[in-house]
Amino acid sequence: MDWTINIQLLFTGLAMGSIYALIALGIVLIYRAADIVNFAQGELVMLPAFVAVFMLNSWELPAYVVYPLVIVFMGGVGYVFERVAYYPLRNRSFLPVIISTIGVSIFLKNSAQYAFGALPLVMPRPTDVDLFVIGDIVIDPQYIIIIVTTAILLVAQHFFFERTMLGKMMQATAQDKEAAQLMGIPIARMIAITFIFSTMLACVAGLLVGPLFYVSKEMGGMAGLKGFCGAIIGGF
């Protein structure tokens, strides 16, 4: 195989792997904090892509305005998700909460179809550069954006959990809820913040992958499945 094709495949693999890593990270965060598997994580990737397409096309706002607004909006969605799907069932067994997240997944998918239609949509790219051409190597600039953004987020997350008080409180909650509560850590608040954080990670994944493919109500299903596989391989 030509070495130029190998390089192009490398960038493609790194970019898509970065997307699945963000999804997997969100799944793992909720699992460790709340002891549940969030089967709606894929739909939390799909929803912000639809919202961004609507704002970019209908409101004609630039991407640097739309993306932060969508991330904040999805943070609110994450909080509502925790209050509705998890909090009332927090003292129940594992199964009802799992079914609740599946219900949220179905609700979000059908809501997206009702609000934005059944046909796939095209998300405008954040840059005007179509392709990077270096000799015989052709690279989609969106791949570079995905890889760089994911790397920055992973470094920022490491700093957040290791250097900030809130991050350490979230870690303590994930490791031992009873001990964290005895130390005065508000574990209910930490779990809610974890849901918000996880949803915002899914949002970033949706905004990054949206320009590469058509935005449809089905896009979250496969992405969520691959992210779930990544979480299993990486270890919950």
How would you name each of these model-derived features?
Residues 5-56, 80-91, 96, 235-236:
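Single transmembrane alpha-helix segments in multi-pass membrane proteins
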Residues 16, 138-216, 220:
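Helix-loop-helix "hairpin" substructures at the membrane interface of multi-pass membrane proteins
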Residues 1-23, 51, 61-66, 92-99, ...:
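Membrane-interfacial amphipathic/re-entrant helices at transmembrane-helix boundaries
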Residues 24-33, 52, 77-78, 82-83, ...:
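Alpha-helical transmembrane segments of polytopic integral membrane proteins
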Residues 60-104, 111:
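Alpha-helical transmembrane segments within multi-pass membrane transporters and channels
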Residues 20, 24, 60-72, 195-202, ...:
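Transmembrane alpha-helical segments in multi-pass inner-membrane proteins
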Residues 88-163, 190:
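Transmembrane helix-bundle core of multi-pass membrane transporters
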Residues 29-49, 63, 91-96, 166-169, ...:
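Short, non-helical or kinked segments that cap or interrupt transmembrane helices
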